[in-house]
Every structure is written in structure tokens, then in C-alpha cells.
Amino acid sequence: MASLLSLSSTPPSTANSNNYPSSTFKGNINNFRINPFNFAPLKLHLRNIVKKESTRLVVVASASSSNVSPSIGSGSETRFRLDNLGPQPGSRKKGKRKGRGHAAGQGGSCGFGMRGQKSRSGPGIMRGFEGGQMPLYRRIPKLRGIAGGMRAGLPKYVPINLRDIEVAGFKEGEEVSLESLKAKGIINPSGRERRLPLKILGEGELSTKLQIKARAFSGSAKEKLEAAGCSVTVLPGRKKYIKESVRKNLARADEYFAKKRAASASEAESA
């Protein structure tokens, strides 16, 4: 023990003194034996490795061009890629992690304040709550339908534009229908769309006179087809299922109004 802790006038070497923390010990530090089982924490070791290997990227924005250069002092050039994107230091602030109790270092209230609704237990205040007054989302006027946020719903037609019909290469006088478009490979409906009818839209121009049959036409498409001399045929829709009792009532109503029209016509002739 005396040999280990013997005082010496020789100053400690700077090379070995860097490996030990500063202390008030005045002896010869070279006599200490290094403990081979004294390892640094794994988390600290990994953090040092990441600091050595990582290079911070600085995006230099200019009016003419944008350059990406590594930070000052880094020897290796690192490319600016999607896998090394990240926010600038200090641009994103971490939320305050509120503890529980005095040991958290935030006092007895733990960062929630003294009293009030926000300091109590539970989920807190619901989103949009304004203290009891009429909230903003209920004060604004209501919009119905798609403008108010409702879904547009499932598609009701298989749409096709005039430019697609022009590219298909139909000859003059040929018939354009859902079957002919399928045969030419212009449309290939699958799943639920196989039972949907055809609708013609007006994007593009058509220079050939054709016989077009579809369930529906947009306004611009109908105008362009009539201007080009095409024949437009609106196909009837699928018959809606009606109960037998409702069908009898409708037939009775049609019969009643037919008699009424005939009576009014006879009165007009006699007058």
C-alpha cells in the first residue's frame, strides 16, 4: 500500500492523466492499475460512435440554385438523400414531460397548475370546447352535400371522354357503345364497374360522324357531338323494383288521371 500511495515529486504525465477524472490526489498517478472490468456504459459508448460517424447537413438556399454541403469540420462529403433528412437543430421543441410527485422536480403541482379543470384527473377538455359559449364549428353556416364534407359516393357510370373515342379509330357511321369500347380495349371495367352504364364526357374533340349510344351525356359532350353531326341515343335505365301493392296504386292513379284528361278534352270540344 505504501508503494502504491508513495508520494513523488515527479509530475504526472499528461498522456495518462487524460484518462482519469480530475481529483485532489497529489501522488504519482502512474502507479494506479487500470481495472479491466471497468467498462463505460453501453449507451454512452453508442452515443460516442454516433457522434463520430454522423455528419450534419446544412441546406443552403439561394435564388438561382440550392446546394447541400456538409457541416464545417467534417472530412467526408455526404449526399443529401431521403434517408438522412432531418429538421434543423432547435427547430422542433420537445413537449414538456410532466411528472408525478415532488421527485419529478416540478413541485407538487407537477406542471399542471394550482387548481382548475385542467389540473384535475381525466382526459381534459374536449376538442373545440370554448368554455360553454357556442363554439366556432357550430356558429358557422352549414353546408349540405359534398360541400359540407359528405362523400361523393360510389361511381354511377363508366366515364369516357371524346378524345378517347377519337383515338380508338372508329370509322364513319360505326356504333359507339359500351360493348364496342370493350372490344377495342378502350375501357376494361372490373368488379363493381362491370354492371355500370356508359357516360360520355366532353373533354377533347371528335371529327368523325358516329352513332353513339350511352346512358348519359354531359352538356358539353352533347353539344360537341351534335355540332359534329353524330347521332346521340340515350339508353333507358334499369327498371327499379316496385312492390306489387305500389304498382297497383300507380296503375289506379294512371287510370284516374287518364279519365280526367279525357273528360276535360270532351268538355273543351263541346264548348
Curated annotation (Swiss-Prot):
It is found in: Plastid, Chloroplast. Residues 91-101 have a biased composition (Basic residues). The keyword Cell inner membrane does not apply. One of its GO terms (cellular component) is cytosolic large ribosomal subunit. Residues 66-76 have a biased composition (Low complexity). Pfam families: Ribosomal_L27A (PF00828). Residues 1-61 form a transit peptide. GO terms for biological process: translation. InterPro entries: Ribosomal_uL15 (IPR030878), Ribosomal_uL15/eL18 (IPR021131), Ribosomal_uL15/eL18_sf (IPR036227), Ribosomal_uL15_bac-type (IPR005749), Ribosomal_uL15_CS (IPR001196). GO terms for molecular function: mRNA binding; structural constituent of ribosome. Residues 102-114 have a biased composition (Gly residues). Keywords: Chloroplast, Plastid, Ribonucleoprotein, Ribosomal protein, Transit peptide. Residues 1-21, 66-120 are annotated as: Disordered. Component of the chloroplast ribosome (chloro-ribosome), a dedicated translation machinery responsible for the synthesis of chloroplast genome-encoded proteins, including proteins of the transcription and translation machinery and components of the photosynthetic apparatus. PANTHER family: 50S RIBOSOMAL PROTEIN L15, LARGE RIBOSOMAL SUBUNIT PROTEIN UL15M. Belongs to the universal ribosomal protein uL15 family. This is Large ribosomal subunit protein uL15c. It comes from Spinacia oleracea. The gene is RPL15.
